[in-house]
């Protein structure tokens, strides 16, 4: 058990003019897709008592769901809170709420830094958000309240989906047990804990009934799903059960730690037609020296072996990964191991970011911190290489047919994604059609041209599913 502070400012007189049920609520969600799910749950909990608006300028209550993962994310969160604080002067905002990882980590500092914040919530306080707002408005609370909570808690419940209606994320677990030396997430989010399978299936069924065609499974480590509550890893069973839901056409899995990918999971990916042949595998580095310093539970040999197995057993598999460059003590030789690895194995989707020295992490205290200029140069070199690899891979797609999940029309052409493309992070397929096509439909498209990352195609069948 631990205590989470909910800081409530004293200047509440201005909020007594109207009943809370008349207020409009606007949400600004920052950070990862797991944070987005939290934002959707918050809106779901508030939707019966408040009117939801997607324009903060029209909102009486503004919620900023922050990210506190790396320095740039923290700065973006602070800048956004300050921007929304100005809405209390220039627009309708009467109540500013900050929540999420940054407030969980830096609640006291934020209270001093940004006194315009009226309420601060930690990452597990969402169940009481309506009660807290009502008490604040009614003036019945003192400046500070303490809530006890167990890190067994998982935020669940009704959601207001904020993504394209044809796709939605489903968080299957909360927290993390990995304790990588550069990462603060386990201290913020707590230990790894899986959701019950029946709750996930019910949520997926509800999403399907609302028109969702693609569900994207997320967690800090999806491959560990079930190990804590069922006694063994059970992601393959979850995939099998989810694929039985009528209306769900694609099931995508993100955040699979390489050392936890297991045979039954690979078999299910290979054999289940609804499970797209796409895995997000956060490798982070390929040098054994750096992997050890990062506290990763794998090795270069094991990573390469897992990639080879996946490609042998699932020939059409698309692998996405990320690398951290400029980690403490990373030499040119260590960095070049990543470069050589990418040249040889040509992963389809790669992202990179520079190491961020996060306080309260072991890596922050390591000797051998790398200059920012060197970090940025390594990131630039890596992404330039990957751009060339992506162009090479894309050229091989010319003439191929893909089922495309349509996501919209930009005024000139339609756009959507093949199974090789995850929402928000990957490219699109652009195509024209004489017929009107609705979002969420599947069409068969032949690729005729490539861009740096996007593909251009022509429709050969305007209703393939």
Swiss-Prot record:
SUPFAM superfamilies: Radical SAM enzymes. The keyword Cell wall biogenesis/degradation does not apply. Signal peptide: none annotated. Residues 23-138 form the MTTase N-terminal domain. It catalyses: L-aspartate(89)-[ribosomal protein uS12]-hydrogen + (sulfur carrier)-SH + AH2 + 2 S-adenosyl-L-methionine = 3-methylsulfanyl-L-aspartate(89)-[ribosomal protein uS12]-hydrogen + (sulfur carrier)-H + 5'-deoxyadenosine + L-methionine + A + S-adenosyl-L-homocysteine + 2 H(+). It is an enzyme of class 2 (transferase). It is found in: Cytoplasm. Pfam families: Radical_SAM (PF04055), TRAM_2 (PF18693), UPF0004 (PF00919). GO terms for cellular component: cytosol. PANTHER family: RIBOSOMAL PROTEIN S12 METHYLTHIOTRANSFERASE RIMO, RIBOSOMAL PROTEIN US12 METHYLTHIOTRANSFERASE RIMO. NCBIfam families: 30S ribosomal protein S12 methylthiotransferase RimO (TIGR01125), MiaB/RimO family radical SAM methylthiotransferase (TIGR00089). This is Ribosomal protein uS12 methylthiotransferase RimO. It comes from Clostridium beijerinckii (strain ATCC 51743 / NCIMB 8052) (Clostridium acetobutylicum).
